[in-house]
Amino acid sequence: MQLTSQAFSYGRPIPKKYSCQGVGISPPLSFSDIPSEAKSLALIVEDPDVPANVREDGLWIHWIVYNLSPIVSNLAEGAQIFAVQGINTAGEIGYCPPCPPDAKHRYYFYAYALDVVLPEEEGVTKEQLLEAMEGHILATAELMGTYEQD
């Protein structure tokens, strides 16, 4: 399975438009080589570079999406999501744009192909989603971009 974006390549800067300094919409994403037996897809976006004085665990969850149809190969930028979204670290449901307070941060986009459609419960946390996916992950993919405020 592969996860790519038309907006940035692995390890490269995420354009400002997708950050708190821009429009703050989600970037375009493309899923490919999805296992044929997949029943759903999930996506977790996180920043592991958060200063300890902001988050003790150093992690900020930017987006949680699950029960995406495996026939959806693309999410357009700012796309309306026809799936279930979880709660991000800001305490909101939906995409939380990159907005690092101190320096360049890395943003990891993790995609999962699952052999089930998960029970729908809006507002789940990353931990709850990972627990629900346990034993059902067929394939994974990763995309990482960076962002640093001007």
Curated annotation (Swiss-Prot):
Q: Which Gene3D superfamilies match?
A: PEBP-like (3.90.280.10)
A Pfam family hit: PBP
Name the chain's protein.
UPF0098 protein TC_0109
Which family, according to the similarity comment? Answer: Belongs to the UPF0098 family.
Tell me what organism the protein belongs to: Chlamydia muridarum (strain MoPn / Nigg)
